[in-house]
A protein has these predicted regions:
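Conserved, structured C-terminal
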Residues: 1-186
Length: 186
C-alpha cells in the first residue's frame, strides 16, 4: 500500500523481495561487544565497536570472520547489542563463528519467546502486537522518535487525529512463570 501511495509522487517504483536471501542474528547482553570484538575484521578492533564510533541506532557494514554483515546497533532486549544481517549462504558459518567466540564469554542461545518477553519488560513495541497501521507514534507511546518541531510526511494527519488511545506498559505482580505475549486483555 505504501508503495502504491508513493508511485503517483515519484513515478514508477519497482520492488524486489530479497527476504529469503538474508538472515539475521541478534547478539545482545553485557558481553556482546566482547564477542564481536573477537571476530571482527577491522584495523582497530579495540574501538570499532565503541559507543563513539558505533552509537545506538546506527548501522554499518562490517566483516565478521569472512562474512559481510550489515550491523545495526540495537537490541530488542534493551541490552547492549547488535542485529547482524548477513547473506543466507553465510548463515551456518557466521553462527559457528559467533558460537565459538561467545563460548569464552558465557554466551547462551535464547529463543524468540525469551526475546519477546525481554522487549516487553523494557517497553519496546512490536509491529503486529502493539504497533500497526492503526496507531500513531504518539498513541504507541513513542514520542522520542517523533520531533514535532520539524515537518515530516504525515505530521498534519497525526496531529489532526490527536491521541485517541495510548499504549502503555503495566507492571503486574503475579506468578513468576507468567510470560506475556502482548495485547493481553485486562
Amino acid at each position: 500500500k505504501a508503495i502504491e501511495d508513493k508511485e503517483a509522487e515519484f513515478g514508477r517504483i519497482e520492488l524486489q523481495d530479497v527476504t529469503t536471501q538474508w538472515g539475521v542474528f541478534a547478539l545482545a547482553g553485557p558481553k556482546a561487544r566482547d564477542v564481536l570484538r573477537d571476530v571482527i575484521n577491522d584495523p582497530d578492533p579495540a574501538t570499532v565497536l565503541s559507543n563513539k564510533r558505533f552509537p545506538w541506532l546506527s548501522a554499518r557494514q562490517i566483516e565478521l570472520g569472512m562474512c559481510p554483515v550489515n550491523a545495526i546497533r540495537v537490541a530488542y532486549t534493551g541490552e547492549l547489542g547488535w542485529e547482524l544481517h548477513h547473506p543466507m549462504e553465510m548463515q551456518n558459518y557466521l553462527f559457528d563463528l559467533l558460537e565459538k567466540a561467545g563460548a569464552k564469554h558465557g554466551m547462551k542461545l535464547v529463543g524468540a519467546r525469551a526475546q519477546n518477553w525481554l522487549r516487553q519488560e523494557k517497553s519496546y513495541r512490536a509491529f503486529g502486537t502493539e504497533l500497526g497501521r492503526d496507531a500513531t507514534p504518539l498513541e504507541a507511546d513513542l514520542p522520542r522518535f517523533v520531533d514535532l518541531s520539524k515537518e515530516f510526511h504525515g505530521k498534519a494527519a497525526m496531529e489532526a487525529l490527536g491521541v485517541r488511545v495510548k499504549c502503555c506498559t503495566l507492571l503486574i505482580d503475579g506468578p513468576d512463570d507468567a510470560d506475556p505475549w502482548g495485547r493481553e486483555a485486562l
